[in-house]
């Protein structure tokens, strides 16, 4: 599966619009590229990404083969309360990976 680098500010003020950045380390192999032997690499893409803020959905995206390797996603949320951001992504094999980050609101 993939690893992710998540950038979430540790402390913010209530009502601030916060930019969340996620870089997912993943090959996003389309299945159309030949290997050195002329066979095709098997398809291996992430098909969806979602983020929740204290269990409330705040962002979601469908990913397609045209998305480059190591997808970078950036979106904003309004900081309303101290809580946990939960990031999840699912690949072609329906394997889901989850990562969390805490955000503290002053």
Q: Which residues are covered by each model-predicted region?
A:
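Short strand-edge motifs at loop-to-beta-strand transitions and within beta-strands
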Residues: 71-75
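Short, charge-rich binding segments
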Residues: 76-79, 95
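Short, aromatic- and glycine-rich surface loops/edge beta-strands on solvent-exposed regions
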Residues: 83-91
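Short acidic/polar inter-strand loop motif in beta-rich domains
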Residues: 91-99
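Short beta-strand edge segments in extracellular beta-sheet folds
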Residues: 102-106
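Extracellular Ig-like/FN3 beta-sandwich strand-entry sites
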Residues: 17, 80-84
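Contiguous segments within soluble domain cores/interaction surfaces
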Residues: 4-10, 14-63, 68
């Amino acid at each position: 599966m993939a690893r992710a680098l998540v950038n979430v500010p540790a402390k913010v003020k209530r009502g601030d619009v916060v930019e969340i950045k996620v870089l997912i380390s993943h090959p996003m192999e389309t299945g159309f590229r030949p290997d050195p032997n002329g066979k095709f690499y098997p398809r291996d893409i992430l098909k969806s990404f979602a983020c929740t803020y204290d269990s409330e959905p705040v962002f979601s995206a469908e990913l397609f083969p045209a998305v480059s390797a190591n997808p970078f996603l950036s979106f904003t949320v309004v900081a309303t309360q101290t809580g946990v951001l939960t990031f999840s992504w699912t690949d072609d094999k329906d394997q889901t990976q989850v990562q969390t980050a805490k955000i503290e609101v002053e």
